[in-house]
């Protein structure tokens, strides 16, 4: 009898040990799983996508834009002849003294279907979208919701890096973050920014200028965190809707898709379509389509103080080499001696803008090529605008 009792006690102890061991192993696995924030976590629909779906419910196509061109004006006739003779494939818009003077398409929006470029054609603006992100950032500064000198981690607590990164360094492309590498695995902006944080800082590039899409993706995420709204909602409520940019849209807005240009490049077999495949992660740095007229409209309204006061606008658009704006680059665009410039290129499309107080020239092409050569010729040689415009070191009121 005594033997049986001892046997039962031993069996009970063994069973208890096994149960405790299994529990500990399960607890450790659970803790490990919870401590890792997955970069590639699947989501049904991002906040940006949800907002755009709701916004576009029942929405019809945008209004049609008419061609604007005066063949009796010698300078616009020269621009037209030059673009035709250079076999330009895209669209142009020129504003003079705040008024649209030329808006015309050349070549094809879709070669396979034979659809021609028109003033209604919308082009993927690529890095020119950083200008809009910069404007949103500037608005938050003026609303005292952010301080440009604060570290990113103040606004995105999990964005921890080996060295502090002020928002200003992201804006100026001197954060030192490793160059962003897009991946089909990243399904939204949040996953892209987590990947950027995980790669961290290149010590050799810290505090040195290195152009990097990743900087503006992180800024887009900061904008979302500070406002509690998606990047897309911020864009529309603070820029797109107030300034009536009705011919601009994010890549996944279905009601606009028939006007989206397809991007191409030439290879050994001829013209090849370049299908955009990572735009869901490019909020803030390259997933908006615009007509050249809408971009010109945006810039002219900024010049007319419809977004910021003169006190903010004039230094923003004219100063460089000053304490406030030591570099030519700021908020997604360049301030240079003879002009202001923004540019973007992605998936065979190039979108370039040159402007001063008199002219805004927007040139968009959808067959990969050198857009800079054409817009320089138009701005410098035809419109004769290669004169001093901004002066280094001069403070502008």
Curated annotation (Swiss-Prot):
Residues 1-27 form the signal peptide. Its EC number is 3.1.1.103. One of its GO terms (cellular component) is plasma membrane. GO terms for molecular function: hydrolase activity. It is an enzyme of class 3 (hydrolase). It comes from the Bacteria. It is found in: Cell membrane. It holds the Pfam family Beta-lactamase. One of its GO terms (biological process) is response to antibiotic. This is Teichoic acid D-alanine hydrolase. It comes from Staphylococcus aureus (strain MRSA252). The lineage of its organism: Bacteria, Bacillati, Bacillota, Bacilli, Bacillales.
């Amino acid at each position: 009898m005594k033997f049986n009792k001892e046997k039962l006690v031993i069996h009970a102890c063994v069973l208890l040990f096994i149960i405790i061991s299994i529990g500990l192993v399960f607890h450790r696995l659970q803790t490990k799983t919870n401590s890792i924030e997955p970069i590639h976590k699947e989501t049904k629909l991002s906040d940006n996508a949800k907002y755009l779906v709701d916004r576009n419910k029942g929405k019809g196509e945008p209004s049609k834009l008419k061609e604007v061109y005066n063949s009796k004006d010698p300078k616009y006739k020269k621009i037209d002849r030059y673009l035709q003779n250079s076999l330009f494939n895209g669209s142009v818009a020129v504003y003079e003294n705040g008024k649209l003077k030329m808006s015309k398409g050349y070549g094809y929006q879709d070669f396979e279907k034979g659809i021609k470029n028109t003033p209604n054609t919308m082009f993927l603006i690529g890095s020119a979208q950083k200008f809009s992100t910069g404007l949103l950032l500037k608005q938050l500064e003026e609303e005292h919701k952010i301080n440009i000198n604060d570290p990113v981690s103040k606004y995105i607590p999990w964005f921890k890096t080996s060295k502090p990164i002020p928002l200003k360094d992201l804006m100026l492309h001197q954060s030192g973050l490793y160059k962003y590498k897009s991946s089909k695995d990243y399904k939204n902006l949040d996953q892209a920014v987590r990947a950027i944080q995980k790669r961290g800082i290149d010590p050799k590039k810290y505090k040195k200028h290195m152009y990097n899409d990743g900087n503006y993706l992180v800024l887009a995420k900061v904008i979302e965190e500070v406002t509690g709204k998606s990047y897309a909602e911020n864009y529309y409520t603070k820029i797109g809707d107030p300034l009536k940019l009705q011919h601009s849209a994010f890549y996944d807005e279905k009601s606009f898709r028939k006007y989206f240009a397809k991007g191409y490049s030439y290879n050994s077999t001829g013209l090849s379509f370049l299908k955009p495949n990572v735009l869901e992660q490019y909020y803030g740095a390259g997933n908006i389509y615009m007509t050249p007229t809408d971009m010109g409209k945006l810039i002219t309204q900024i010049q007319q103080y419809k977004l910021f006061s003169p006190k903010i606008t004039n230094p923003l658009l004219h100063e460089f080499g000053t304490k406030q704006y030591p570099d030519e680059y700021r908020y997604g665009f360049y301030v240079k001696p003879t002009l202001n410039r923004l540019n973007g290129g992605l998936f065979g499309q190039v979108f370039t803008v040159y402007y001063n107080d008199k002219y805004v020239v927007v040139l968009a092409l959808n067959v990969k090529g050198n857009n800079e050569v054409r817009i320089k010729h138009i701005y410098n040689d035809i419109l004769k605008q290669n004169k001093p415009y901004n002066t280094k070191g001069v403070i502008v009121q």
